[in-house]
Amino acid sequence: MKFSKLSLTLALILTQAIFVLCGKINEDFMENGLESHALHDEIRKPIDTEKADAERGVVDCVLNTLGCSSDKDCCGMTPSCTLGICAPSVGGLVGGLLGRAL
């Protein structure tokens, strides 16, 4: 294949531009380390204690409740208590089969 002088020149310029860009990114990383990245920002964010307490409450509820006697015993995770088991309400053919099985 024959390439024109213009296409070779453009390819060379583009390659050099990519190397310069990668060099700038690498230089920034070498100077600042992880501090310049989004991962570092996420690690440094404070923990939302209200959300953690709510999650802990749900986990405690699930671990303390082996069976259910009413919908309230399902910890709000599934809508219905069926035959002592917290089961989601599923419609259609699958729901009918699950309903008969439970």
Swiss-Prot record:
SUPFAM superfamilies xref list: omega toxin-like
Molecular function per GO: calcium channel regulator activity; sodium channel inhibitor activity; toxin activity
Example of a GO cellular component annotation carried by this entry: extracellular region
Expressed in which tissues: Expressed by the venom gland.
Region forming the signal peptide: 1-23
Sites of Leucine amide modification: L98
Name assigned to this protein: Omega-hexatoxin-Hi2b
The organism's taxonomic lineage, starting at the top: Eukaryota, Metazoa, Ecdysozoa, Arthropoda, Chelicerata
